[in-house]
């Protein structure tokens, strides 16, 4: 297996893309993955969507996303019609009808373990998972229990395999951690590093 540990991808102005290409040998088949920074569909972006449509947001990057084997975004908002905001400073929400546009743009995976997919509470979080799945997008860093939320996601092409981990290390404002309820992965970095090491050892 080929493994890549991605610690942080930081977006400044605009979006920064990280491209990974995993190859058995230079002349053999490759697995290419694009990673983006935050994808937020609220605030000023919501106004742009109202004016030009959600598809317009991805026009310039859709060819790239569709040219690789997988595209992983950091989804920086819940996708839900639920309006049950947590008591926190910044609250975001995306409309469910926009989820399909993400898939049509070539997005295949969405990292959910961050400080904003929880903005509309646990119901909004579970909605997000369902809307992603129904649009053909694989959630990463989410599960029906705390242990399930930290399970890695496999991306495979032929004999090439890449495993994705997604965990949030930031303190989550007014979010209640419940071990046996739907949630996002909140595994400390040192534990995550140890798990990756063990996984690599068990899957050489």
Predicted regions and their residues:
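Intrinsic low-complexity/disordered segments
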Residues: 2, 21-22
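Bacterial N-terminal signal peptides that target proteins for export
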Residues: 2-11
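Bacterial N-terminal signal peptides
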Residues: 10-21
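Acidic, metal/ion-coordinating pockets
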Residues: 23-204
